[in-house]
Structures are given as structure tokens and as C-alpha cells.
């Protein structure tokens, strides 16, 4: 019998601000096999981890991810909405999130591609290949056809 995999949706989002590095760390600390994260593209074509198109619910400003630059997003507090102990938690880049997961042996990653763009095959593998160790599993529940192109093969 196969043991089910536990994938923490947006990290340990009950315990920490969703889709943040602290949420991904906590998910692994409590025993998850992997994390699911939402990827969006910023105004200046950077890839960040955030579920909603708008930042309104998680910051003190109103705006859409794709209308804001990486610098503008990195200046925002994405943690205080959850609890004061998470004040100044910043939005994570895809690169930062993948590097964190690569440092936690055996961590599986599922990417949910949220932005209204369709360049997944060229953006996803490049970032993943730079930060993931050989054989690291990755998938995209919303775009299963991209999964083979995103997984890094052992050499």
C-alpha cells in the first residue's frame, strides 16, 4: 500500500502567513512531505510567490501583483495581517522559495501558476534548474503538462 503524501497548501498557512518562507519552513517542521506555492509575475517580469492577484488582503496597500515592481513588493509587510509576530515578513521570489526547499532534503514542490501569462515552459525550468538538487520532484497541479519540463534529472 502506498503512503499518501502530505503537501502543505501555501505552506503551513494555518500557522504562518500563507505562501511565505516562514510558512514553508513551518510546513516541513511539522512533517509535510512538500509544499504547494502560487507563482505570479510582477510588473518587471520577476516571479514571486503569492496566491491572490491583489495584495489588499495581506498588506496595507491596494494593488495587483502584475502592476507592482519587485522593489515595491519587497517593501511591503506580508505578515502582520496574520499576527504581529510575523511583522515585516516579505514576499518571496520563486528563486528564494525553491532555494529554501532545496535546502530541506526530500521536500516536494508543487507550483500553481496564477498569473495571466503562459510562458511556463521557459520560465519555470530555468529557475528550478538553478536551485534544485538533482532528482528533486516538482509539479504543477494547474498545468500537469509542464511537470516533465520542470523536473530536474539526475546526471
PLM regions with names:
Residues 1-155:
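Phosphate-group recognition and catalysis centered on beta-loop-alpha active-site segments
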Amino acid at each position: 500500500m502506498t503512503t499518501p503524501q502530505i503537501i502543505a497548501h501555501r505552506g503551513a498557512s494555518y500557522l504562518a502567513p500563507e505562501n511565505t518562507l516562514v510558512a514553508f519552513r513551518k510546513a516541513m517542521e511539522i512533517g509535510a512531505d512538500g509544499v504547494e506555492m502560487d507563482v505570479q509575475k510582477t510588473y518587471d517580469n520577476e516571479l514571486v510567490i503569492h496566491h491572490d492577484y491583489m495584495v489588499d488582503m495581506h498588506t496595507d496597500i491596494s494593488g495587483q501583483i502584475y502592476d507592482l515592481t519587485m522593489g515595491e513588493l519587497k517593501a511591503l509587510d506580508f505578515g502582520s495581517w496574520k499576527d504581529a509576530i510575523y511583522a515585516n515578513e516579505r514576499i518571496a521570489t520563486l528563486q528564494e522559495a525553491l532555494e529554501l526547499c532545496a535546502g530541506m532534503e526530500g521536500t516536494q514542490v508543487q507550483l500553481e501558476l496564477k498569473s495571466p501569462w503562459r510562458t511556463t515552459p521557459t520560465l519555470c525550468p530555468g529557475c528550478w534548474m538553478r536551485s534544485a538538487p538533482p532528482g528533486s520532484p516538482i509539479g504543477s497541479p494547474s498545468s500537469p503538462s509542464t511537470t516533465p519540463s520542470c523536473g530536474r534529472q539526475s546526471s
